[in-house]
Amino acid sequence: MFHGTTILSVRRQTPQGVQVAIGGDGQVTLGAIVVKGTARKVRKLHHGKVLAGFAGATADAFTLFERFEAKLDKHQGHLVRSAIELTKDWRTDRVLRRLEAMLAVADQESSLIITGNGDVLEPEQGIIAIGSGGAYANAAAKALLNHTDLSAADIVKQALEIAGELCIYTNMHHTIETL
């Protein structure tokens, strides 16, 4: 659906508590041309308590980031409620309905995908992978989560490297954020 990026979020339960990490590559393409290799597609929101990443049209994603952060502020950082309220707006607002982007969002309690159709999805295994390299990153993250003791951040790093080796729209310049 979206070319030009891979976003991956992993949550891991450890004896010390829940680890949550999100990462993305930095490649931006315009058709078949790489126009930027160091874009920052993941960030912390709501006073550093929520992680978010986007795949899709950049301007559309920034619009969603702004609206999602406003919902987080309005609902005191409650991730699920903010996501649902954003998707309600998404489905009823004529401008939002035309936005071509997906968001991956996570806090200490939940990880969610907010789709371009206005859906909110919570993955069962705590792994979110979106964008053109998402399937590669998802498979790598599942294997690493199930068969290693790597931290969530290290799983994100390794899985993004694997996706970057396989997906022509994903590069090796990664930004990784953790909670």
Swiss-Prot record:
| Annotated Na(+) binding sites | 164, 167, 170
Pfam families for the chain: Proteasome
> Can you name the source organism?
Verminephrobacter eiseniae (strain EF01-2)
Name-wise, this protein is ATP-dependent protease subunit HslV
Q: What does this protein do?
A: Protease subunit of a proteasome-like degradation complex believed to be a general protein degrading machinery.
The record's Gene Ontology cellular component field reads:
HslUV protease complex; proteasome core complex
Identify the NCBIfam families for this entry: ATP_dep_HslV, PRK05456.1
List where in the cell it is found: Cytoplasm
- Which keywords, in A-to-Z order, does the entry hold? Allosteric enzyme, Cytoplasm, Hydrolase, Metal-binding, Protease, Sodium, Threonine protease
Q: Which HAMAP family match?
A: HslV
Q: What does the annotation say about its assembly with partners?
A: A double ring-shaped homohexamer of HslV is capped on each side by a ring-shaped HslU homohexamer. The assembly of the HslU/HslV complex is dependent on binding of ATP.
Q: What is its EC number?
A: 3.4.25.2
Q: Catalyzes what?
A: ATP-dependent cleavage of peptide bonds with broad specificity
Q: Which family does it belong to?
A: Belongs to the peptidase T1B family. HslV subfamily.
